[in-house]
């Protein structure tokens, strides 16, 4: 297993082992976030990151991800192959070091990789530690090498198993069911969303996802490939919105040795949608690259608008927010040594990145505005309208602030509050309609459960201007009941959760089409105006039963058609089925037993796996554009629960 060790060559000596991995199995959440669905998918991303690092270094352009029938998963690339030579310090093959030492990998060696997504993660060794079985196969220097592992430990030494013309690495793993006790079943859409994102962020590479599960496995799979990168990404994200200008404004370059890519487009909506990435990592909490983008955008557009004289008649100052209304933008930077901060370590802290992005955006926009004066005028007109709407919205928002319980106003009259004042213990149910609200009030545990009835369908915030949102009585009641305010020391628009009164906010609607629509309206509001509640894990959806199956003295609830059929078969002839179309059809005891009792109920926690994809879906379902919505409904009709 000898390897030539010249500078800039990826070899056994490029691999640096930082620490042991005994810890991983005992404290998996420290390494992958959690051991639920999100943590399970994080395993895949860690392995794919290795292949993406090879692509960033210019050595790989094809990656294949296969969900196997036995719930294992395979990642294959056509890179150089992980080095297999003997590691000087460790005395074993470099492949074994990479696979069994936490933090080991070429990503810590600057001669092998200039930038790396893997730096943020914990490497393929953590995946190995959390897998009941793993196999690594390496195609390198005309030979095939392989090694297998059980729960992070090598079963045998790295062995040569033949000759090959290929290069690359294949890793297959099966998550350990003693650690991932909830599920080891991969979600196709979750993986597809991330792989699509990676294809857009790394134009030119091909990423294929194959699912071999089920009766009709698709061996061809789905191919993600982008020639235009962020330009295509932004068109995909904004496909369901009406464009304000035809062009995507984009740039790709380097400032102070920091590669910067930006794409942006204006639409007719009232929402700001900024997506930022560092070394392919989605930085949900933003950071210096995003603040640099905002500064460059605001200063350049303000300078142009002032010079044009279009702002002369405005009676109030324009703010940075006004320049970003109706803007969808993606900022992607590559940083050699990223420093991550924030609650979830997804906020970039490198100060030098801010000026690099700000300068890049300023130059890009100056050129565009100069060459496209008609589009420039349309953008500035939109900014002026946004400023006027913000001025109106501020007054409405101040009304919301004044009405919050903590600032002297009273709680909404319809709120039936709970006795406890410990937010960690308290939960509030948002219930459609007064009749269902009455049943819920009777059925609840008054010590820790509050009920807020909502009158019919709340406002569709996707189509409404901001001041209309804050003027809406139902929405104002939600703000007041929850005790949240708008504005923190860092951000005047951010949600202030310091005085949040409930740590479980449960949407409880009828199990019919109308109920689903109301749930979606409420979720759209939370996503657009109270996203921090979702990101902090406070939003849940109740799951009331669809059926009650009875025979004689026996009765059982069913939450799906399949469950209903099983119960009918079990009960035999003479069983009767009651279909619950509304919460009001259940009495207080039934509602408590099935939907509100913490010991028996099922709550679905609302999370955001992929912000860009969530944004796209909400725009498509709740926005103005009808054709994409119709196409989605036709494609998904077979999964729908339709009442006729």
Where are these regions (language model features)?
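GHKL-family ATPase ATP-binding module
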Residues: 1-14, 21, 45, 53-55, ...
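Conserved activation segment
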Residues: 21, 28-29, 95, 587
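Conserved short strand/loop->alpha-helix "switch" segment adjacent to the catalytic nucleotide/phosphoryl-transfer site
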Residues: 26-45
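A short glycine-centered beta->alpha linker in the GHKL/HATPase_c
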Residues: 81-86
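Short adenine-binding "F-helix/F-box" segment of the Bergerat
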Residues: 87-88, 95
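C-terminal interaction appendages of subunits in large macromolecular complexes
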Residues: 388-407, 422-427, 438, 442-444, ...
């Amino acid at each position: 297993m000898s390897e030539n060790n010249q500078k800039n060559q990826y070899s056994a000596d490029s691999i640096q082992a930082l620490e042991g991995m005994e810890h991983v199995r005992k404290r998996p959440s420290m390494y992958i976030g959690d051991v639920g669905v999100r943590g399970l998918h994080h395993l895949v991303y860690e392995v794919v990151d290795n292949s993406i690092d090879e692509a960033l270094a210019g050595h790989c352009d094809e990656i294949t991800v296969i969900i196997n029938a036995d719930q294992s998963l395979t990642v294959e690339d056509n890179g150089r192959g992980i080095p297999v030579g003997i590691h000087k310090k460790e005395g074993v093959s470099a492949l074994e070091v990479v696979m069994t030492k936490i933090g080991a990998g070429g990503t810590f060696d600057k001669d092998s990789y200039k930038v790396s997504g893997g730096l943020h993660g914990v490497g393929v060794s953590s995946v190995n530690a959390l897998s009941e079985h793993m196999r690594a196969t390496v195609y390198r220097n005309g030979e095939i090498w392989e090694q297998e592992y059980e729960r992070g430990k090598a079963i045998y030494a790295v062995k040569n198993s033949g000759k090959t013309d290929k290069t690359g690495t294949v890793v297959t793993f099966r998550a350990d069911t003693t650690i991932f006790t909830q599920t080891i079943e991969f979600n196709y859409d979750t993986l597809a969303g991330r792989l699509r994102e990676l294809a857009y962020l790394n134009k030119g590479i091909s990423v294929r996802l194959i699912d071999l599960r089920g009766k009709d496995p698709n061996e061809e799979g789905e191919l993600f490939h982008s020639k235009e990168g962020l330009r295509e990404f932004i068109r995909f994200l904004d496909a369901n919105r009406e464009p304000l200008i035809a062009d995507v404004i984009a740039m790709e370059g380097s400032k102070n040795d920091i590669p910067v890519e930006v794409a942006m487009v204006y639409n007719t909506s009232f929402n700001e949608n900024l997506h930022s990435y560092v070394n392919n990592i989605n930085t949900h909490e933003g950071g210096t690259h995003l603040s640099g983008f905002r500064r460059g955008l605001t200063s350049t557009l303000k300078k142009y608008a002032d010079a044009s004289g279009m702002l002369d008649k405005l009676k109030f100052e324009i703010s940075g927010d006004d320049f970003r209304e109706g803007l969808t933008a993606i900022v992607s930077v590559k940083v050699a040594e990223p420093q991550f901060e924030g609650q979830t370590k997804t906020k970039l802290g490198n100060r030098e990145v801010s000026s690099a992005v700000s300068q890049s955006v300023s130059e890009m926009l100056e050129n565009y505005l100069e060459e496209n004066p008609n589009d420039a005028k349309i953008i500035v007109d939109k900014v002026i309208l946004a400023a006027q709407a913000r001025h109106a919205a501020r007054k409405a928002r101040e009304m919301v602030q004044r009405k919050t319980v903590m600032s002297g106003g009273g709680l909404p009259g319809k709120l039936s509050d709970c006795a406890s004042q410990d937010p960690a213990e308290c939960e509030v149910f948002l219930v459609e309609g007064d009749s269902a609200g009455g049943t819920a009030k009777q059925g609840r545990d008054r010590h820790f459960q509050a009920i807020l009835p909502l009158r019919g369908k709340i406002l569709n915030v996707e189509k409404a201007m901001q001041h209309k949102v804050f003027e809406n009585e139902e929405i104002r009641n939600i703000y007041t009941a929850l005790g949240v305010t708008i504005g923190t020391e860092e951000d005047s628009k951010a949600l202030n959760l310091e005085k949040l009164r409930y740590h479980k906010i449960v949407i409880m609607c009828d199990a019919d089409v109308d109920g689903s629509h109301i749930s979606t309206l409420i979720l759209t509001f939370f996503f657009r105006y109270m996203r921090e509640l979702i990101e902090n894990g406070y939003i849940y959806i109740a799951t009331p039963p669809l059926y009650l199956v009875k025979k004689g003295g026996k009765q059982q609830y069913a939450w799906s058609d399949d469950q209903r059929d099983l119960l009918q078969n079990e009960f035999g002839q003479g069983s009767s089925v009651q279909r619950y179309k509304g919460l009001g059809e259940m009495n207080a005891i039934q509602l408590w037993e099935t939907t509100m009792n913490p010991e028996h109920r099922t709550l679905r926690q609302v999370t955001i796996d992929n912000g860009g994809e969530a944004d796209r879906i909400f725009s498509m379902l709740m926005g103005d554009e009808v054709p994409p919505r119709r196409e989605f409904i036709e494609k998904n009709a077979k999964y729908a629960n339709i009442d006729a």
